[in-house]
Amino acid sequence: MKTLEESIDALMTRYKENVPVRYTEYVEEWNSPIYGTVIDENTVEWTPCRQPEALNFDDLESALEMSFHQSIKTLFGRWYAGDLALDYQGHTISLLQTQSAEDGERLLENITGHILMKRRLKQPETVFIGLGSEDDGLLVTIDNQSGAVGLEWVGKEQHDVLSDSLAAWLDNCQPQVETDKNS
């Protein structure tokens, strides 16, 4: 059985092989190491690169008085990349990634808001890792206790478990080829 790190790396390799030209939102202030050719003021080609230091969840864990499931920290602390357009069993998913250290901090802020919403609604804590592009408001999340990957609507509990582990779920995701830079 592969480790989560091996599953993440294998997905990134499949993505690079199947999507040779990749586009993402260009944020000039970030000076992201993934940026290649700037297409226009909003779009840039990108190439994934390993994070020199993993995104650090320590301060957020301390502030929220909780620990995040290791799979969440591993996913967001391994690579800098644009979001990955994936196919999972016939469904299009956008797997969220961080482009730079600054983007990682923005992600941590968004995770904070999500956790606080879950607490206010008295729902099990999850962390979003992706978006279902077929339906507005459909999130791909990791259950913070079990590590299960599932689907949930914004403000609702996970309603469909896709996999018991992130590694197994990633192994079943396939890159979706973008047809143009505005995909």
Curated annotation (Swiss-Prot):
Gene3D superfamilies: Syd protein. Keywords: Cell inner membrane, Cell membrane, Membrane. It holds the Pfam family Syd. It is found in: Cell inner membrane. InterPro entries: Syd, Syd_sf. One of its GO terms (cellular component) is cytoplasmic side of plasma membrane. It is a peripheral membrane protein. Signal peptide: none annotated. HAMAP family: Syd. Belongs to the Syd family. Interacts with the SecY protein in vivo. May bind preferentially to an uncomplexed state of SecY, thus functioning either as a chelating agent for excess SecY in the cell or as a regulatory factor that negatively controls the translocase function. This is Protein Syd. It comes from Idiomarina loihiensis (strain ATCC BAA-735 / DSM 15497 / L2-TR).
